[in-house]
């Protein structure tokens, strides 16, 4: 759905790097390299990015909103 502000496991703030991650991912960069550059080091935090659906620059939330 909407990208979380904090990691569900450790509570670290992760939303502050989400826009840059999304833009660089859209440009075709490797997700692993992006997260390394953004210094997202914990596996639990990296999981939050890896499991968040982005399909053709649309999030799951964008699809669900259509069915009010």
Swiss-Prot record:
One function term, GO molecular function aspect: DNA-directed RNA polymerase activity
Reaction(s) this enzyme catalyzes, per UniProt: RNA(n) + a ribonucleoside 5'-triphosphate = RNA(n+1) + diphosphate
Cofactor binding comment, as recorded: Binds 1 zinc ion.
SUPFAM superfamilies in UniProt: RNA polymerase subunit RPB10 (SSF46924)
Cell membrane recorded as keyword: no
Top class in the EC scheme: transferase
EC number: 2.7.7.6
Cofactor(s) required, per the database record: Zn(2+)
Cellular localisation: Cytoplasm
HAMAP family: RNApol_arch_Rpo10
Protein name, per record: DNA-directed RNA polymerase subunit Rpo10
Lineage: Archaea, Methanobacteriati, Methanobacteriota, Methanomada group, Methanococci
Gene giving rise to this polypeptide: rpo10
